Amino acid sequence: PKLKLSVRKGASADIPLRIETGTLSFVAISAMTNSAPLRVTATGHNIPDGWYAAIVDAQGMTELNAADSNEILDIEFHRVTWIDANTVDFDGISAAGFQSYTSGGYLAFYAPMSLASYTSASMDVKTRVGGDVILALNTTDGTLEIDAATSTVWIRLEDDSLDAVPARDYVFDIELVHATAVDAICSAESVLTVLPEVTTSV
């Protein structure tokens, strides 16, 4: 996929990249609450914290149902918070004014990709595809981190990490390394926008 990220000069940043497979998984819903945020019960959902999920075919509370259960749009996926093994909250979604849930429905989400076999990662930032590397991030110096437990690659920047990088748009790619191969997790045309530093008086 082609990613779009933004960071600001002079500011630290911790950016999570959730790495998913192309497999769409479904878990049966047994309850949805008229609350803010919306809380959904789906026994044994296995959805990591901060993942994105959609709702399909729920009865009663139909407001968040995907228009087509077999062609779910990107905008129909919402970030969820892991509450426990059977429950998630839909971040920023108030269901207080929704119709009451009656039955049925599924949580739909792309299954997390296993990162257990990967030993390192690197990210090269360039002015153009095939150009010189302006900024190199990697797991060796701690600017990248592989969190296999949550299928997440973290970008970790200190407030001085971008001192030598002018504010503008760049392209980047990220590669994961294991014993026998190197796998790209995003398009080489992914965009990193470096924003100018905002200074304040002390």
Which sequence ranges carry the predicted segments?
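Contiguous segments within soluble domain cores/interaction surfaces
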Residues: 1-25, 111-202
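Small/polar beta-strand repeat architecture
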Residues: 26-117, 123
